[in-house]
């Protein structure tokens, strides 16, 4: 059973049945409209975000499996901030503000893909991304919050999410 793996990055819930995906699917003898609909259904919870998708196709039987990855950290943060794109000048132009708990949620979602061993370390990593794309967190600079996390000022809040962190795959 030879399989072909197709890796693509799509806009969640908004894949169109055109190039570059359609020609590849057609060559494999797949129904383009059906596959596109299934990808859109599978990624609908990530509307407006860039989502990695892997399509595993059995080239003999034409059966396929859609594996949806986790959107980029930047996409998740921008979604929480209701911002459309990162700042081109994050030091001077802020594009939005999110809650510290949103940072924790993103850290938990991204656990399978980040190297941090603890929730605290993961949160600091996500705060770094928030800083680099021009977001503030609870109206403060993410850099300030990294320092506050190091000083233990968020330990109680982080403790509330430890269970979710430990249950997350990764």
From Swiss-Prot:
Q: Name one GO molecular function term.
A: structural constituent of ribosome
Coiled-coil stretches: none
* Superkingdom as given in the UniProt entry: Archaea
Q: Which UniProt keywords apply?
A: Ribonucleoprotein, Ribosomal protein, RNA-binding, rRNA-binding
Sorted alphabetically, which Gene3D superfamilies does this protein's record hold? Ribosomal protein L11, C-terminal domain, Ribosomal protein L11/L12, N-terminal domain
UniProt keyword Transmembrane, yes or no: no
Tell me which CDD domains the record gives: Ribosomal_L11
Q: What is the similarity comment for this entry?
A: Belongs to the universal ribosomal protein uL11 family.
Quote the subunit structure annotation: Part of the ribosomal stalk of the 50S ribosomal subunit. Interacts with L10 and the large rRNA to form the base of the stalk. L10 forms an elongated spine to which L12 dimers bind in a sequential fashion forming a multimeric L10(L12)X complex.
Q: What is this protein called?
A: Large ribosomal subunit protein uL11
Species for this entry: Sulfurisphaera tokodaii (strain DSM 16993 / JCM 10545 / NBRC 100140 / 7)
User: Could you tell me the gene encoding this protein?
Assistant: rpl11
């Amino acid at each position: 059973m030879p399989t072909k793996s197709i890796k693509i990055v799509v806009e969640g819930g908004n894949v169109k049945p055109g190039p570059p995906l359609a020609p590849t699917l057609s060559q494999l003898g797949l129904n383009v409209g059906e596959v596109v609909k299934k990808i859109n259904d599978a990624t609908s919870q990530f509307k407006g975000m860039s989502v990695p998708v892997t399509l595993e196709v059995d080239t003999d039987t034409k059966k396929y499996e859609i594996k949806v990855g986790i959107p980029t950290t930047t996409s998740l943060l921008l979604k929480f901030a209701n911002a459309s794109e990162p700042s081109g000048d994050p030091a001077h132009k802020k594009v939005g503000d999110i809650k510290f708990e949103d940072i924790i949620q993103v850290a938990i979602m991204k656990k399978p893909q980040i190297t941090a061993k603890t929730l605290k370390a993961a949160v600091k990593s996500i705060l770094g991304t928030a800083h680099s794309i021009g977001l503030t967190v609870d109206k403060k600079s993410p850099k300030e919050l990294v320092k506050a996390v190091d000083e233990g000022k968020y330990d109680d809040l982080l403790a509330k999410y430890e269970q979710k962190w430990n249950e997350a795959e990764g």
